[in-house]
Amino acid sequence: MAARRKARKRALDLLYEADQKAVSGGAPASGDAVALLAERIATPHGEAPMREYTVEIVEGVAAHQARIDELLETYAQGWSLERMPAVDRAILRIGVWELLFNDDVPDAVAVDEAVALAAELSTDDSPTFVNGLLGQLLRLAPVLRDEEAAAGG
């Protein structure tokens, strides 16, 4: 497994765990993800060292989560964030962050990696759902990036 794919999977684990803790405890998920990341870096409990790209993903998703969630709510036809499987929600947050806020990842790679994570870790229908939603955002990416630049994001 490529280094970035491993980093994405680890970031997915952290975002998913933070999301689940937020659902059960009522705390904001983005703050929990960064706090959970810091905790794991400080006390790794036998885990491999945290990859730099894992840190970048978690911090990036947390920094832009309000906008990412707004886009997901807007373009996920017939689905609210709460109704989506939690794994899909985390995968989509990573995918949207890579598409719109990370210039180092080619757009097609961001979509393909998100679909691969969905195929590996979620429901049978998830890869199609993730591909369709990220594909729609990919088509809108130039406009969305311009909006982010104009807003200072």
UniProtKB/Swiss-Prot annotation:
GO molecular function, one term: RNA binding
InterPro entries: NusB-like_sf (IPR035926), NusB_fam (IPR011605), NusB_RsmB_TIM44 (IPR006027)
Record-level GO cellular component terms: cytosol
Matches recorded under Pfam families: NusB
Keyword Transcription applies: yes
UniProt keyword terms in alphabetical order: RNA-binding, Transcription, Transcription antitermination, Transcription regulation
One GO biological process term: DNA-templated transcription termination
Its job: Involved in transcription antitermination. Required for transcription of ribosomal RNA (rRNA) genes. Binds specifically to the boxA antiterminator sequence of the ribosomal RNA (rrn) operons.
Family: Belongs to the NusB family.
Matches recorded under NCBIfam families: nusB
PANTHER family: ANTITERMINATION NUSB DOMAIN-CONTAINING PROTEIN (PTHR11078:SF3), N UTILIZATION SUBSTANCE PROTEIN B-RELATED (PTHR11078)
Official protein name in the record: Transcription antitermination protein NusB
Organism: Beutenbergia cavernae (strain ATCC BAA-8 / DSM 12333 / CCUG 43141 / JCM 11478 / NBRC 16432 / NCIMB 13614 / HKI 0122)
